[in-house]
Amino acid sequence: MKKLLWASAAVALLAGCAGLPQTSRTAAIHEIKFEANLVPADLTVRVGDEIRWVNHRTLPVLIDIPGLNAEMLSCDRGFSNMFGTARELTELDPSKSVSLCFSKPIVISYNARMRSADPGGMKIEPGTIRVVAPPQ
């Protein structure tokens, strides 16, 4: 019975992975850090590079990327819901990271919403990511 259960689990896993899209990831990883400020606020990467946001703060950070959708992505960790739909807004807990890879050249503007001692209790910092085509 256990062998049948293991075999069924293996078949289900393989069938589930068969439908995953091919990625065009490169080996390059670019970190955007949340510390006292967003660093770097402006970043230029190539198609397929991984952009990784890392929260070094003691409070969660909200990352808001208006217009984000699955068609523009070649990888996604932390920006999609349990159904695989890309979310424009994601919360990043302290000492955690999320990442995206873009599948085509695009300019992305986003906001980082960080809780702070500033009046209003929220510090909003804009960021820009320029995704350029790989060299020919």
Q: Which stretches of residues belong to each language-model region?
A:
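N-terminal edge beta-strand
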Residues: 22-50
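Asparagine-centered strand-capping/turn motif at beta-strand->loop junctions
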Residues: 54-57
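Short, Lys/Arg- and Gly-enriched loop/turn segments at beta-strand edges
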Residues: 59-68
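Short aromatic-acidic-glycine turn motif
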Residues: 69-77
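Extracellular/periplasmic metallocenter environments
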Residues: 84-136
